[in-house]
Structures are given as structure tokens and as C-alpha cells.
Amino acid sequence: YLYQWLGAPAPYPDPLEPKREVCELNPDCDELADHIGFQEAYRRFYGPV
């Protein structure tokens, strides 16, 4: 028997997570993301988010 109402709700999946992972696997994109943010770094390397 599970006490589902006691746990935190499941977080909604992040639609940008697959793109974030692509950027993290590219050392240059990952480094740039640390400075200017993931979305801008991804845009510079791969185009529109």
C-alpha cells in the first residue's frame, strides 16, 4: 500500500533537457553555457533552441 499523497509531486519533464544534454557533451558549448547560459550557448553552436 503506497501513501502517494505524502510524497512530492513528480516534476514536469523539462522540454529542453535533451538539448541541454547535447550542449553538456560538447566541452566548448558546456564551457560557454557556464558563462552566458545554456540557451544562448546552444543557439550559438546549434541554432535556435
From Swiss-Prot:
Main location: secreted
Residues the record lists as binding Ca(2+) 3: E24, D30
PROSITE patterns recorded: GLA_1, GLA_2
SUPFAM superfamilies hit by this protein: GLA-domain (SSF57630)
Modification sites for 4-hydroxyproline: P9
GO biological process: biomineral tissue development; bone development; brain development; cellular response to insulin stimulus; cognition; glucose homeostasis; learning or memory; negative regulation of bone development
Positions bearing 4-carboxyglutamate: E17, E21, E24
Domain named Gla: residues: 1-47
Entry's family note: Belongs to the osteocalcin/matrix Gla protein family.
Post-translational modification as stated in the protein's UniProt record: Gamma-carboxyglutamate residues are formed by vitamin K dependent carboxylation by GGCX. These residues are essential for the binding of calcium. Decarboxylation promotes the hormone activity.
Superkingdom of the organism of origin: Eukaryota
Keyword tags: Biomineralization, Calcium, Disulfide bond, Gamma-carboxyglutamic acid, Hormone, Hydroxylation, Metal-binding, Secreted
Function: The carboxylated form is one of the main organic components of the bone matrix, which constitutes 1-2% of the total bone protein: it acts as a negative regulator of bone formation and is required to limit bone formation without impairing bone resorption or mineralization. The carboxylated form binds strongly to apatite and calcium. The uncarboxylated form acts as a hormone secreted by osteoblasts, which regulates different cellular processes, such as energy metabolism, male fertility and brain development. Regulates of energy metabolism by acting as a hormone favoring pancreatic beta-cell proliferation, insulin secretion and sensitivity and energy expenditure.
GO cellular component annotations of the record: cytoplasm; extracellular region
Gene that this polypeptide is encoded by: BGLAP
Cell compartment(s), UniProt: Secreted
GO molecular function, one term: hormone activity
Binding site for Ca(2+) 1: E17
S-S bonds: C23-C29
Protein name (Swiss-Prot/TrEMBL): Osteocalcin
Record: residues binding Ca(2+) 2: E21, E24
InterPro entries from the UniProt entry: GLA-like_dom_SF (IPR035972), GLA_domain (IPR000294), Osteocalcin (IPR039176), Osteocalcin/MGP (IPR002384)
SMART domains per record: GLA (SM00069)
